[in-house]
């Protein structure tokens, strides 16, 4: 699952999910036996074996927008759900984005931090310094927060064979794009699908996206 903002917005019904609707969605997941895992956990189990919960779900947030820390994070904590925050590193500590202290709190609460590049460029349509955006963002996050970032999210959900291979070769164990596929395997660990949750979805539409009812 992919979210961008959890906040009120009367005009943007794609990227903004209202806090009330988000709380209802998280309650639905809990009521239906879903357990949140991280992308790193999924990759580890697929590669090396192990056991996942009966109904695993990965709840991701792209860009590091500050609103989800004050709206989504408390709701998820109450439901004992963890998430994955894919951060654009040059936006950390900027207005309306997560602060370094907030990122640290997420880490201490069991959240995974992933890379969403340094500047969020369209790496498919434009010439981009892949080493800077893909490797540099990981190194910056690793050093600043004392972690080992192993998950990547492609900006705009876009990738190609060159970009996928670059991510594969530079310290990541998985990478995510957009898409509705729910079955993941070792063959697509660097092309994982995430269903984008729009603010216009009602609860019936949300439930229909979930693999277990």
Question: Which residue stretches match the model-derived regions?
Answer:
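C-terminal active-site subregion of NodB/CE4 polysaccharide deacetylases
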Residues: 1-60, 65-67, 120, 124-213
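Generic structural signal for short, solvent-exposed loop/turn connectors between secondary structure elements
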Residues: 9, 92-103, 110, 123-133
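Acidic (Asp/Glu)-rich catalytic clusters
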Residues: 73-80, 98-115, 168-169, 186
């Amino acid at each position: 699952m992919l979210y961008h903002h959890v906040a009120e917005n009367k005009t943007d019904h794609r990227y903004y999910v209202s806090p009330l609707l988000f709380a209802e969605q998280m309650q639905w997941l809990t009521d239906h036996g879903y357990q949140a895992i991280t992308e790193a956990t999924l990759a580890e189990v697929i590669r090396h074996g192990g056991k996942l919960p009966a109904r695993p779900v990965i709840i991701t947030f792209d860009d590091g927008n500050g609103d989800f820390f004050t709206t989504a994070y408390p709701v998820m904590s109450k439901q004992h759900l963890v998430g994955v925050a894919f951060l654009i590193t040059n936006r950390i500590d900027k207005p309306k984005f997560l602060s370094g202290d907030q990122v640290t709190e997420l880490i201490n609460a069991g959240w995974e931090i992933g890379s969403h590049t340094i500047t969020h460029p369209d790496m498919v349509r434009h010439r981009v310094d892949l080493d800077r955006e893909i490797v540099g963002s990981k190194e910056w996050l690793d050093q600043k927060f004392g972690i080992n970032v192993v998950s990547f999210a492609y900006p705009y959900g876009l990738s190609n064979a060159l970009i996928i291979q670059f991510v594969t070769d530079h310290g990541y164990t998985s990478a995510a794009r957009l898409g509705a596929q729910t079955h993941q395997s070792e063959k697509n660990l660097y092309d994982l699908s995430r269903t984008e949750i729009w603010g216009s979805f009602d609860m019936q539409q949300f439930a229909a996206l979930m693999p277990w009812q």
